[in-house]
Swiss-Prot record:
Binds 1 NADP(+) per subunit. CDD domains: ADP_GME_SDR_e. This is ADP-L-glycero-D-manno-heptose-6-epimerase. Catalyzes the interconversion between ADP-D-glycero-beta-D-manno-heptose and ADP-L-glycero-beta-D-manno-heptose via an epimerization at carbon 6 of the heptose. Its cofactor is NADP(+). It comes from Psychromonas ingrahamii (strain DSM 17664 / CCUG 51855 / 37). Keywords: Carbohydrate metabolism, Isomerase, NADP. The gene is hldD. The active site is at 139 (proton acceptor), 183 (proton acceptor). Its EC number is 5.1.3.20.
Amino acid sequence: MFIVTGGAGFIGSSIVKSLNERGITDILVVDDLTDGAKFVNLVDLQIMDYMDKDEFITQIVSGQDFGDIEAIFHEGACSATTEWNGKFMMENNYEYSKDLLHYCIERDIPFLYASSAATYGGNDTFKEELKYEKPLNVYGYSKFQFDQYVRRIWEDAAAHDETLPQIVGFRYFNVYGPREQHKGSMASVAFHLNNQLNAGENAKLFEGEHKRDFVYIGDVCKVNLWFFDNNVSGIYNLGTGQAESFLEVGQAVVAYHQKGEVERIPFPEHLKGRYQSFTEADLTNLRAAGYKDTFKSVAQGTAEYMAWLNR
């Protein structure tokens, strides 16, 4: 059996889909469906069972035996970079992750989890090293602190010559693609621009030359499953390694629709200083781990995404 936390969410449900494509259906999806709109992500998927996140945490903490677990893909988190309730964020993203990690260590279960490029904050170097990690918001801090916790676990195990199961964290950069529609304001810029053009408006982008490392969801799933297949541990950047501008996203959306144009709007005051204006994954460690596949460009990924959204 596989367990996917956040399995009704964007990345989680996409991993479930990728497992289904391998013929794997013995999957326990864990999520919080208080936002009932997320159920849409599960409609076309084959799963064995669904469990509410709070019930799952209770069972994990009490040491419940779930039977033979091949791996846990831990994608469940509060991913809103605009959320400033630190207590809520640390409970959701840090304490929950620690409980799951120890459950996996005690039972020798591979643990593949979602970290984030938000751990780097306003840096212009995006390499998996402490000196480059300075998060700008409490979401990034919660992810950073769990990465630090994992590093201490590795150090402690090495000092005592202990063997650990696979533990791998992926620092997701700007992921976009199918199954993110429930995220509202946190959905990708491509999603919002598509809605604007379908409403007869122009594609509105903030002023400035902001560039991000936009990575297509299909590539994110491929990396997750490659690491599971190859039993490699570590913390790795998961982006394309190539920053592209929001303008290029806008142009790709306009090119698909063959109408409208990119329109510039003022950058919101409340986001200044709390917003990464540039991200670009350093893929040195990912490539050294053995992952060789290429990543879709913004033009390629956006075209595929637009075809899915407007199907």
